[in-house]
Amino acid sequence: MSDLVKVTLPDGSQKEAPRGTPVIDFVKGQIGAGLAKAAYFAKLDGAPVDLSRALDRDARLEIVTTRSPEALEVARHDAAHVMASVVQKLYPGTQVTIGPAIEDGFYYDFARETPFTPEDLEKIEKATNEAIKADLPFVRSEISMEAALALFEGMGERYKVEIVKDIAAKGAKTLTLYKHGDWVDFCLGPHGPSTGRIGVVKLLNVAGAYWRGDAKNAMLQRIYGTAFFDKKELDAHLAKLEEVKKRDHRRLGPQLGLFTFHEYAPGAPFWLPAGTVLYNVLEDAMRRLVLKNGYQEVKTPLLFNKRLWETSGHWGKYRENMFLVVDSESDPALALEDRCSFSLKPMNCPSHHLIYRMDKRSYRELPVRYFTTDALHRNEASGSLGGLTRVRQFEQDDAHIYLREEQVTDEVLRIFELMKVVYGAFGLGFEATFSTRPEQRIGDDALWDRAEALLRKSLDATGLKWTLNPGDGAFYGPKIDMLVTDSLGRRWQTCTIQLDYAAPERFDLTFVGEDNKEHRPVVIHRAIYGSFERFIAILTEHYAGAFPAWLAPVQARVVTVSDRFDAWAREAAAALQARGWRVEVDGSSDKLGAKIRNAQLAKIPFTLVVGEKEVEARGVSPRRHGGEDLKTMPLETFAELMAREATAPF
């Protein structure tokens, strides 16, 4: 074995180094001090490693600097370790559990009987930033599972012991530890060179979290925080968080009269008049779009016998997420679960399969596209419910497409075209992820191989960049998920395209081919909005409640200088309403300034001022939401403006 290893750099050039040279020493000696100073971690043959890792083989080397978002993610994980060490120092007896980096920050879950207070958070944050300044190195080591178990048992860390036992049960022989100062934790890494490289930490809030996400387990305290290399970047992020709070749909929804919730129906929104208008506008727009693109609308029952779910596989794989209904004719002596022969449908696909199966199908008919907005019910854990983004009752712009295998790629491209129209209308950016087979699934590996290969080919044909999300597919097939980006740069999962070879087998779905023989179709499950509830939450925050004129529950409000102009105000509103616009009149006795201010607070796209000159001109003086005044114009001219700006774009 040679004493030298070949190191291939990103530009393709190669250098040699003595075997065992730490990455950081190689960078200092053969690339430059500037890169070494900026380096945070490295990648060897694509795998992330610490800068202290030895070059023990020929490999491709990439240095990740503090200019990279990937470095910031590692720094945030570093910050989680430092914060956890501080918490245990300040509050002896606190148990540590897990503490990953997450998008825009990090968290760590602690087991402690006494709740953390806002004052505690300030104290922890100050001590964390002081610990960072100590510039302690992160030291990596590997120990046997037996030694790891003895270590954490000796420390009294029962949650860590549980995790170590689980890792050992999966066949692992060693465990990676990271230590800074006298505090140690296990994780895969990598970590930065030392605590001093982390930057500045800000702790955000404390929330409850069940151990391992299971409500049957102990409730822990989760401290959320974030970290940035530069304080200016942190300040900008905190300003963004303040804007996020202002836009929170849970705040704006009730404020704008869109929706509310009640304890008698947890997880099921009450749509108020304004919200119902918004909901219906979105639904009607999608309906128009899909019906002119070859879809047929159907409606199916909400309640089904369990035999349907046994056929589909949901009874065995998804029952814990279903609302079960007792059969009134069942034996009262049976256990409650055994008396539940029915359930509310958690998804539409099985009932659509029944419709498809009702007729003999020819290859000439395919694709057959069924669309619905039926209500669905899923028994989500109460602790996971949150506003409109996680609910128990919802509707989707749901469609199921039955087609031949060779039609799949073209159909996926058609769906992407619809998606571009919809997301483009709202100014939402988007990107794709490809999710492959999960551990819990139906269908054999051969079917999954075909399904994944075909959906991957279809995704490649769209020309979009995408990322792999292994193991996150539906239990019946792989899927493409779309992540839309809102006006604050946040990503939300919405559209899904799922490929299903299993359902045609389970439901005995067929079509007669050109050879006059029966064949199995392929099924595509797809939704573009996702759920209406979640999409409305996204749009509410995207627009900060100031919806575009075509979508706004009230498109224009007429306000008068005084009540002597009420007659023309009502006549003008009625004329606009007759053309289909959503217009109302402020008939209050408030002064004009208050009326305008109230319309602005209600985020109505157009406020139409009516006074003496408007009555004489039989017109209005429009003011856009946000304050832009338009000149006085005849009512007909404003109606033409509405036709341009308030007509649904799809």
Curated annotation (Swiss-Prot):
Broad enzyme group: ligase
Positions of region (Catalytic): 248-548
Family matches, as NCBIfam families: thrS
Gene responsible for this protein: thrS
CDD domains for the chain: TGS_ThrRS, ThrRS_anticodon, ThrRS_core
Enzyme nomenclature, EC number: 6.1.1.3
Any one GO molecular-function label of the UniProt entry: metal ion binding
Cofactor info, note text: Binds 1 zinc ion per subunit.
Subunit comment: Homodimer.
Purpose of the protein: Catalyzes the attachment of threonine to tRNA(Thr) in a two-step reaction: L-threonine is first activated by ATP to form Thr-AMP and then transferred to the acceptor end of tRNA(Thr). Also edits incorrectly charged L-seryl-tRNA(Thr).
Subcellular location: Cytoplasm
Cofactor(s) needed: Zn(2+)
Organism: Anaeromyxobacter dehalogenans (strain 2CP-C)
InterPro entries: aa-tRNA-synt_IIb, aa-tRNA-synth_II, aa-tRNA-synth_II/BPL/LPL, Anticodon-bd, Anticodon-bd_dom_sf, Beta-grasp_dom_sf, TGS, TGS-like
Lineage, top ranks: Bacteria, Pseudomonadati, Myxococcota, Myxococcia, Myxococcales
One GO cellular component, as annotated: cytoplasm
Reactions mediated catalytically: tRNA(Thr) + L-threonine + ATP = L-threonyl-tRNA(Thr) + AMP + diphosphate + H(+)
Residues engaged in binding Zn(2+): C349, H400, H525
Alphabetical UniProt keywords: Aminoacyl-tRNA synthetase, ATP-binding, Cytoplasm, Ligase, Metal-binding, Nucleotide-binding, Protein biosynthesis, RNA-binding, tRNA-binding, Zinc
Pfam families membership: HGTP_anticodon, TGS, tRNA-synt_2b, tRNA_SAD
UniProt-recorded name of the protein: Threonine--tRNA ligase
